[in-house]
UniProtKB/Swiss-Prot annotation:
One GO term describing the cellular component: cytoplasm
Taxonomic path: Eukaryota, Viridiplantae, Streptophyta, Embryophyta, Tracheophyta
InterPro entries associated with the record: Aromatic_deC, PyrdxlP-dep_de-COase, PyrdxlP-dep_Trfase, PyrdxlP-dep_Trfase_major, PyrdxlP-dep_Trfase_small, Pyridoxal-P_BS
Family listed: Belongs to the group II decarboxylase family.
EC number(s) on file: 4.1.1.105
Full protein name: Tryptophan decarboxylase TDC2
Length: 498
């Protein structure tokens, strides 16, 4: 049990005003200056943090301060202790993973979200929050030219989740419960789900959380000749084998723009198979979906009208800050039936009238933030035209990098570029042992990242180790791409001459 602190200072405690408007105004101005200076000087920091594991614990006290500390002292410690341990995702020299894009518009939208601190679990708790989210989800659906079956103006609807993981989990639970109504809960062990060996790793995690047995997760092999896209014929064979074995096909997750190489699963032929067997057909377009607001890329979503759900993450490419994943479903009632809660303390007339949407029933948790403000500010501040230009600019810079790679015979493009990701490797001796080539590229990756000037990552697909160069950080310009290529070539020179 605890004990009363005999040194408790009631006078000092009584002076604490956690939200005094003028003090907030002063500190907020200081923080905005701090953030603006950080963005302005971000290139002065190593892109990839150079600290060792456990570095921070030795720098900070073992216990929280008993007395308040000046705001200026806290900011000073951010400079001294926190920034050295930050990998700078907003650096224009960050070419790793996929980008987490930002903008001034999204930032001020986030400020308002934090300002209101509304917990919009149902309509009554925050009417504007719920209704604005419905509006921006329909706006984005229109930008993507989704059918009305996915919009609130039509028969479907959309909700902002935190990440793709949550979007997949929610739709998987909805599909599971719908199936179990027919076959009985005791048959959950018969449910089988499908994806490719390029489907994001979060899929398996969501399946485990939804009670799908690991042995019932089908990860269908893809081939380099098909650019690692999921084969409808292979899917059909897997399903046929499962049906013959008495299993129950449940769910298919296709991907438009896989994480490793941006492979694109062709939706229409996959929909043929999924619809024939009554699978819930989900499309994960977390990264590449945003590009489909550009007419020249929209065809990658052809067939989406035959899917049950679609998710994409504006925080990756639509300047919207983390976290923001948009999920659309054709039949919201199926999702709501699986995820709804109705405790007495949340009962209210608008909800009971069925005239409003309660987003708590569209997600795993109950509480939710006013994330729609970020998208609303971004869409209104930049307009569709500028968002399209932003995406096209990133893709053009990736094309430029691709041309650099093709101009040096020591390097090769491993997988055809589609969007703003270039998958390449150093392969100066085309007939050399693959193990030696992999080791050489591992060394090149380590050399480049150790400089702190650039950060890139790798993947391994079809047994081939390759480097990933993902253009997309908000501040990246052509000269950053040129400088990154120059550094990569220097690394290759150093390794090949050693």
């Amino acid at each position: 049990m605890g004990s009363i602190d005999s040194n408790y200072d009631t006078e000092s405690a009584g002076q604490c005003r956690p939200l005094e408007p003028e003090e907030f105004r002063k500190q907020a101005h200081q923080m905005v200056d701090f953030i603006a200076d950080y963005y302005k000087n971000i290139e002065s920091y190593p892109v990839l943090s150079q600290v060792e594991p456990g570095y921070l614990q030795s720098r900070l006290p073992e216990t929280a301060p008993y007395r308040p500390e000046p705001f200026e002292s806290i900011l000073k410690d951010v400079h001294k202790d926190i920034i050295p341990g930050v990998t700078h995702w907003l650096s224009p020299n960050f070419f790793a993973y996929f980008p987490a894009t930002v903008s001034s518009a999204a930032f001020v939208g986030e400020m308002l979200c934090t300002c209101f601190n509304a917990v919009g679990f149902n309509w009554l708790a925050s009417p504007a929050e719920l209704e604005l989210e419905m509006v921006v989800m329909d706006w984005l659906a229109s930008m993507l030219k989704l059918p009305n079956s996915f919009t609130f103006l039509g028969t479907g609807g959309g909700v902002i989740q935190g990440t793709t993981s949550e979007a997949i989990l929610c739709t998987l639970i909805a599909a599971r419960d719908r199936a179990l109504e027919s076959i009985g809960v005791d048959s959950i062990h018969k449910l089988v789900v499908y994806g490719s060996d390029q489907t994001h790793s979060t899929y398996a995690k969501a399946c485990n959380l939804a009670g799908i047995l690991p042995c019932n997760i089908r990860s269908i092999r893809t081939e380099a000749v098909a650019n690692f896209s999921l084969s409808p014929d292979s899917l059909h064979r897997e399903i046929e084998a499962d049906v013959a074995a008495g299993m129950v096909p449940l769910y298919l997750c296709a991907t438009v723009g896989t994480t490793s190489t941006t492979a694109i699963d062709s939706l229409s032929p996959l929909a043929d198979v999924a619809n024939d067997y009554g699978l819930w057909f989900h499309v994960d377009a977390a990264y590449a979906g945003s590009a489909c607001i550009c007419p020249e890329f929209r065809h990658y979503l052809d067939g989406i009208e035959r899917a049950d759900s679609l998710s994409l993450s504006p925080h990756k490419w639509l300047l919207s800050y983390l976290d923001c994943c948009c999920l659309w479903v054709k039949r919201p009632s199926v999702l709501v039936k699986a995820l709804s809660t109705d405790p007495e303390y949340l009962k209210n007339k608008p909800s009971e009238s069925n005239s409003v949407v309660d987003f708590k029933d569209w997600q795993v948790g109950t509480g939710r933030r006013f994330k729609a403000l970020r998208l609303w500010f971004v869409m209104r501040s930049y307009g569709v035209a500028n968002l399209q230009s932003h995406i096209r600019s990133d893709i053009q810079m990736a094309k430029m990098f691709e041309e650099f790679v093709n101009s040096d015979p020591r390097f090769e493009i491993v997988v055809p570029r589609v969007f703003s990701l270039v998958c390449f490797r150093l392969n100066p001796f085309s007939k050399s042992d693959p193990c030696n080539t992999e080791l050489l590229n591992r060394k090149l990756l380590e050399w480049v990242n150790s400089t702190g000037q650039v950060y890139i990552t790798h993947t391994k697909v079809g047994g081939v180790y390759m480097l990933r160069f993902a253009v997309g950080a908000t501040l990246t310009e052509e000269h950053h791409v040129s400088a990154a290529w120059k550094l990569i070539r220097e690394g290759a020179d150093a390794l090949l001459c050693s």
